[in-house]
Amino acid sequence: MDLQSLTYLFVGISFTLYIGIAIWSRARSTNDFYIAGKGVSPIANGMATAADWMSAASFISMAGLIAFLGKDGSVYLMGWTGGYVLLALLLAPYLRKFGKYTVPDFIGTRYYSKAARLVAIICLIFISFTYVAGQMRGVGIVFSRFLEVDINTGVIIGMLIVFFYAVLGGMKGITYTQVAQYCVLIFAYMVPAIFISLLITNNPIPQLGFGDKLIGSSTYLLDKLDQLSIELGFNAYTDNTKSNIDIFFITAALMFGTAGLPHVIVRFFTVPKVSDARKSAGYALVFIALLYTTAPAVAAFAKINFIDSVQKVEYESAPDWFKNWENIGLIAWKDKNEDGLIDYSSGNALEGIKPKYTNEQGKYGERKVANRPDYSNKNEV
């Protein structure tokens, strides 16, 4: 069975599981629809909260950001993890105790001010729409990747599926669906990380393999990444390029922004008691940490694999994933020196923010782009 068939099989099985759970646990009352009848156990709620928190931004973008930015990408780890700690310790239990479902409701009641409530609502709308835009883009990328459709089509498919789950099951159905989703998500994330860690460092624990020596070599993985990055014209992978004040304010913005997300806050109302809300927060932090501590390792493995797979490789011999990404618009190659080799280094390959594809193919079979090449550097990807 080829890779595409296996992808369809496993995705089909997971969606069948989600649909079955959504039907089995569908909401039968208003209480079920909005707060799952306050009958969810702390462990199940912790898993559902973790699945909520670790959406497309974490599952797809976290490792990608760290791979692209190097050590500077750690601000996103600190910001998103810190945001959850802020929410779990200082917001959610007290909102639950106060009896309000949202931050604007709490602020309006606590300060006896409709104006304060309105300001909080406006802030929350901006935060939520910014967050949802990223999530839906991530959904589109995932569906475009395995269905081989346009990203915009992938976004529409994802919206329809989410609408189906939300309307049918309400919070009760979504909660138990997300418990299953967390199990599938963490399995899908950890298994490749473990095997890649074994292949690269002979260490089965990605978090430790990240700082280990390369297999058959006395060179550490991060030292090798630093060396390759400098050779290609980038900053060393483990160097900071941002100032401490930038790091502080980016981390703070992420913390305060994500701490107020309504779809996560409402999770703390689905358990029977305030003490259970605190317990579920602790469980969720453990479940989230499992992925977040693996993300830097996945980023390093992906970066070194990307460089080894494409640098100075003939386009016709490029890995299948490279051409698949090209077909769905995730990557572009412009042969600036017309030698047929992929040359990856620092700088922009093309003029403009993103590639503008034509319907033509180049002489090596690559997708042609309308953008003019940027000849100020050697990068072709």
Feature names for model-found ranges:
Residues M1, S58-L65, A133-G140:
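Membrane-embedded alpha-helical segments in integral membrane proteins
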Residues M1-F59, R117, A166-G169:
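Membrane-interface "cap" regions at the ends of multi-pass membrane proteins
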Residues D2-L3, K38-V40, A44, S61-V75, ...:
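Loop-to-helix junctions at membrane interfaces in multi-pass transport proteins
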Residues L6-G20, G79-L86, V119-F129, I157-F164, ...:
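Lipid-exposed faces of alpha-helical membrane segments in multi-pass integral membrane proteins
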Residues Y18-I19, A50-A51, S74-G169, D223, ...:
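Helix-loop-helix module between adjacent transmembrane segments
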Residues I21-V40, Y94-D105, K114-A115, V264-G282:
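Membrane-helix boundary/linker segments in multi-pass transporters
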Residues D52-A57, I127, G134, I194-L198, ...:
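Hydrophobic alpha-helical transmembrane segments in multi-pass integral membrane proteins
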